[in-house]
């Protein structure tokens, strides 16, 4: 149990780390000159697709300050592809993974995206890495039209209710803050029967995206929100807390990440607020539980969301450890493994000539199960990242402050009884 809790906490830290040339269009179909009575395949395969292999790649920080994240992340991707390749590949093709080291630098990331797509001729991006690089290149990725599976960040630009056209090739897996904000409201209503919800959110992208998601779901459910904004990293949030307290809400969303959430929780306790709080998976770490456990004791509970369930993933963890023995307990390698899995599941579904359009169709054709978590459904252009999340709360784990599991992975529909 202690090992699992430690890994879960480390997975939350992944998000904190992850907190140009002419564009090449997708290959066009070539008209066939074969007589109609002898139909043959006339589609040309997409770039990066060969008779015996399919080439994919990414740029990630494998040197510099973020190398401890980027190196195992890519190792996880490579381990998954090695497993697939040694079993014969996908439809007779091995998966070849190429990589550029962008050092977490958005300028280098833009240049390396150009190299990967136009020089290396990759079929798809797998594991586009880091908030600054993804933020700087997301429009370029869309302009190329290349499929991009798994982003090591949760920025709001990845979210789309119905992706079409140039937006369609974006396939996020990690939680996106906008989706998480919606799930927080679904938990508040479904689990805690809240009718009036307070939201304290920071004025940075994370806080605004969480609040945006909460607003959308509250409007859909006809639930009242009372919201107060605070400065990210603020040391005094007393005014916002007083407003929420006086509004007599049923439940509170702490839409802030590590630098601010302890201040919010401590001030709620100081003002003797007795309403439970829920916060983002990014905060589900020992550092946060240790910071607030003494202040909240007996006053209210602090809950956090999560996107993996290692306690019920023993077989998947054993398979991961077999193929990535040097990284068997490394959470960054686990996320790379997840990235490799999602790409491969889409590829397995493609029939006939492998094109970008067919691959996108394949990813949208049915939900895909996270080997360590819930399912993600890309149907009808849904690009929401993780859509099933579990629940834990601050408490004692092995006589130390930690996060105690409360409820398993559930979708918003399940939480709301739909």
Regions found by a protein language model. Give the residues of each.
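Extracellular/periplasmic periplasmic-binding protein-like sensory domains
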Residues: 268-337, 411-413
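Extracytoplasmic ligand/sensor domains, especially the bilobed periplasmic-binding protein
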Residues: 121-228, 276-297, 301, 310
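Segments of small-molecule ligand-sensing domains
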Residues: 327-333, 344-401
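Bacterial lipoprotein signal-peptidase II cleavage site
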Residues: 18-29
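Positively charged n-region of N-terminal signal peptides that target proteins for export
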Residues: 1-4
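Immediate post-signal peptide segment of exported/extracytoplasmic ligand-binding proteins
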Residues: 27, 35-58, 86-94, 189-195, ...
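Beta-alpha junction/loop-to-helix N-cap segments that form part of ligand/metal-binding clefts
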Residues: 44, 68-75, 87-161, 229-238, ...
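Extracytoplasmic "Venus flytrap"
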Residues: 41-50, 57-78, 100-107, 129-130, ...
């Amino acid at each position: 149990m202690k090992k699992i809790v430690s890994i879960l906490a480390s997975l939350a830290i992944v998000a904190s780390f992850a907190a140009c040339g002419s564009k090449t269009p997708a290959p066009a179909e070539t008209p066939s000159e074969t007589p109609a009575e002898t139909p043959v395949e006339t589609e040309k395969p997409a770039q990066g697709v060969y008779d015996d292999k399919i080439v994919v790649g990414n740029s990630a920080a494998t040197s510099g300050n973020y190398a401890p994240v980027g190196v195992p992340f890519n190792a996880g991707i490579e381990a998954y592809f090695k497993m697939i390749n040694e079993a014969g590949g996908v439809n007779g093709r091995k998966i070849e993974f190429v990589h550029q080291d962008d050092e977490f630098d958005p300028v280098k990331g833009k240049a390396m995206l150009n190299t990967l797509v136009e020089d290396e001729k990759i079929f798809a991006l797998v594991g586009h890495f880091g908030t600054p690089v993804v933020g700087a290149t997301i429009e370029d990725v869309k302009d190329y039209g290349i499929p991009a599976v798994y982003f090591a960040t949760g920025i709001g630009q990845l979210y789309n209710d119905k992706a079409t056209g140039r937006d369609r090739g974006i396939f996020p897996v990690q939680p996106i803050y906008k989706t998480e904000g919606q799930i927080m409201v679904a938990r508040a209503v479904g689990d805690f029967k809240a009718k009036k919800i307070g939201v304290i959110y920071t004025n940075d992208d994370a806080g605004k995206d969480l609040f945006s998601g909460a607003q959308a779901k509250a409007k859909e459910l006809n639930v009242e929100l009372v919201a107060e904004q605070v400065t990210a990293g603020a040391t005094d949030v007393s005014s916002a807390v007083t407003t929420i307290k006086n509004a007599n809400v049923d439940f509170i969303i702490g839409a802030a990440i590590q630098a601010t959430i302890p201040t919010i929780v401590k001030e709620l306790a100081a003002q003797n607020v007795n309403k439970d709080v829920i916060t983002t998976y990014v905060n589900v770490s020992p550092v946060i539980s240790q910071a607030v456990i003494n202040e909240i004791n007996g006053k209210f509970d602090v809950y956090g969301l999560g996107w993996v369930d290692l306690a019920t993933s023993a077989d998947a963890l054993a398979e991961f450890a077999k193929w990535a023995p040097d990284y068997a307990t490394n959470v960054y390698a686990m996320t790379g493994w997840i990235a490799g899995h999602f790409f491969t599941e889409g590829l397995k579904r493609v029939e006939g000539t492998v094109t970008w359009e067919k691959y996108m169709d394949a990813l949208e054709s049915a939900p895909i199960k996270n080997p360590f978590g819930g399912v993600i459904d890309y149907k009808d252009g849904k690009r929401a990242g993780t859509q099933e999340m579990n629940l834990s709360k601050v408490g004692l784990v092995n006589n130390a402050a930690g996060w105690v599991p409360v409820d398993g992975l559930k979708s918003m529909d399940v939480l709301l009884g739909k």
